[in-house]
UniProtKB/Swiss-Prot annotation:
Modified residues (Phosphothreonine): 137
Full protein name: Armadillo repeat-containing protein 1
Gene Ontology cellular-component annotations: mitochondrial outer membrane
Principal location: cytoplasm
Region (Disordered): 239-261
UniProt superkingdom: Eukaryota
Organism per entry: Pongo abelii (Sumatran orangutan)
Gene: ARMC1
Length: 282
């Protein structure tokens, strides 16, 4: 990297910047503004080619959040280097399995954004088969677990929950639905949902139940056993940002920081984007 020591001492490192963008992208109210910003999306694309695996994984989580907004998908797909970088992550032999699955999921979403149903289905199946080939037989198809989390009632609790989930080996991505205290988690098929519950229980302030549908289609809450489950730690991921560094500490501030006030709010995104652009060439 060609950033000088003095520059790095005055500015946050690449991982911190990507983590902050990921945190902002976790809030649905921020997603359009981030994608419309001229520098953030290119910065995240550059992040996918970063030599530090945690930077790549965090950037993919941010992109996964952004892709949940349908209005963002066409622009994301057309952004220079987006699809090629996702392919590179999927095909690189040194990429961790969870990161490959996450990149494949984003690729599927963007690739199907403007295709006919039949073409979309065929392309997604082809992409999944290719991803599975590179993942190997131990990482079979991912599954989705919906959790109702008692105590998930503010941003600080969400950050605690994120920290716990990010440490679990086998977690691919997750999305919070704060209004109904839920978290939708994509995990490897060989990871048990009980591991998620144990990790959330380790926060001491939250408890998870699984949301399932009955035969009649009604949703039911199924409690997990109180017996702790041994969780395999994901040692490749970094410690989560401390609360005082998180730009989403308060929702209204996060929104204004993104785009409500051009002279103040958008400047943080511009600073972050400029830093990413300067730092990710090596």
């Amino acid at each position: 990297m060609n950033s000088s020591t003095s520059t790095m001492s005055e500015e946050p490192d690449a991982l911190s910047v990507v983590n902050q963008l990921r945190d902002l992208a976790a809030d649905p109210l921020n997603r359009r503004a981030i994608v419309q910003d001229q520098g953030c999306l290119p910065g995240l694309i550059l992040s996918m080619d970063h030599p530090n695996p945690p930077v790549v994984h965090s950037a993919l989580l941010a992109l996964r959040y952004l892709a949940e907004c349908r209005a963002n998908r066409e622009k994301m797909k057309g952004e220079l280097g987006m699809m090629l970088s996702l392919q590179n992550v999927i095909q690189k032999t040194t990429t961790p399995g969870e990161t490959k699955l996450l990149a494949s999921e984003i690729y599927d979403i963007l690739q199907s954004s403007n295709m006919a149903d039949g073409d979309s289905f065929n392309e997604m199946n082809s992409r999944r088969r290719k991803a599975q080939f590179f993942l190997g037989t131990t990482n079979k198809r991912a599954k989705t677990v919906v959790l109702h989390i008692d105590g998930l009632d503010d941003t600080s609790r969400r950050n605690l929950c994120e920290e716990a989930l990010l440490k679990i080996k086998g977690v691919i991505s997750f999305t919070f639905q704060m209004a109904v205290q839920r978290c939708v988690v994509r995990i490897r098929s060989d990871l048990k949902a009980e591991a998620l519950a144990s990790a959330i229980a380790s926060t001491k302030v939250m408890k998870a139940q699984q949301v399932v549908k009955s035969e009649s289609g009604e949703e039911m809450l199924v409690p997990f056993q109180d017996t702790p489950v041994e969780v395999e730690q994901n040692t490749e991921l970094p410690d989560y940002l401390p609360e005082d560094e998180s730009p989403t500490k308060e929702q209204d501030k996060a929104v204004s920081r993104v785009g409500s006030h051009p002279e103040g709010g958008a400047s943080w995104l511009s600073t972050a984007a400029n830093f990413l652009s300067r730092s990710f060439y090596w």
